[in-house]
Regions:
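Beta-propeller blade termini
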Residues: 67-78, 119-130, 158, 171, ...
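Gly/Ser/Thr/Pro-enriched helix-cap/hinge segments flanking short amphipathic alpha-helices
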Residues: 1-70, 103
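Repeat-based blade/solenoid architectures
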Residues: 42-70, 111-125, 150, 171-183, ...
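Hydrophobic beta-strand segments that make up the repeating blades of beta-propeller
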Residues: 83-88, 136-140, 195-199
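Short glycine/acidic-enriched loop and turn motifs that connect beta-strands
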Residues: 90-93, 142-146, 201-205
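A generic tandem-repeat structural signature
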Residues: 114-161, 165
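Beta-propeller fold detector
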Residues: 34-40, 105-111, 166-170
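Beta-propeller blade repeat segments, especially FG-GAP/WD-type strand-to-loop junctions
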Residues: 93-107, 147-168, 207-217
């Protein structure tokens, strides 16, 4: 309904007949070729724990234990197909999916179970040992335990070249901080990728400035 030139200095009462009203739905432009197409990936559902940060820290603006999962992609078995890593949460192990001609298939990595209590808040693939395949960095984070807990351990998994990964223990000291971001970079230009880890927060001590770290490879 359009009212042309309504009189001024008057009260106009407009009554809509709701019995005949229809919502306005604009017609979407039809294209011969869609830009995106849905693909059934058959990935396992992510599961969060029931921890509530506000019970411990009442002054935080949002929960710092629900910032995952983080993922990463790389061709880990040299078949020219991108494979997929999805980080886990407290109580759920991380998952690795190998891409094939029929889609993605879950690859069993037993060492992922060792840190199933960690919230994965950063991850990326890189060639850590310079053997020509893609290894995996996983950042430990969250806010479900005090800073002294080992759930904040950052992890390095070495690739056997066929899609199997083994935890390289002792690669990083426990940072005791909530990992916010991790970036591979060759800061000293020696041909090896080093790692910068930016901390988001001190676990369960919101407001305290956390330390960040630079690891030399």
């Amino acid at each position: 309904t359009t009212i042309q030139k309504p009189a001024i200095n008057q009260l106009h009462k407009i009554v809509y007949d709701l019995s005949t009203a229809k919502p306005h739905v604009p017609n979407a432009e039809k294209t011969e070729t869609a830009l995106f197409q849905e693909i059934a990936l058959q990935l396992n559902k992510h599961s969060e724990d029931d921890h509530v940060d506000f019970y411990v820290e009442r002054n935080i603006p949002f929960m710092l234990s629900k910032l995952g999962p983080k993922g990463a992609t790389a061709d880990i078995n040299k078949d020219e197909l991108e494979d997929l890593f999805i980080g886990g949460a407290n109580g759920q192990a991380s998952q690795l999916y190998i891409q094939g001609s029929n889609g993605f298939k879950l690859q069993q990595i037993p060492d992922f179970e060792k840190y199933k209590f960690t919230d994965v808040t950063a991850s990326f693939f890189f060639d850590a040992d310079q053997d020509g395949d893609q290894d995996l960095f996983v950042g430990g984070g969250g806010n479900t335990a005090p800073a002294a807990s080992d759930i904040y351990q950052n992890q390095l998994y070495l690739n056997d070249g066929k899609g199997g990964f083994t935890l390289k223990s002792g690669s990083f000291l426990i940072s005791h901080t909530n990992c916010g971001i991790a970036i591979p970079l060759d800061y000293d230009k020696d041909g090896k990728l080093d790692i910068f880890i930016g901390s988001r927060s001190e676990p369960q001590q919101y407001g305290i400035a956390p330390k960040s770290f630079l690891y030399h490879n």
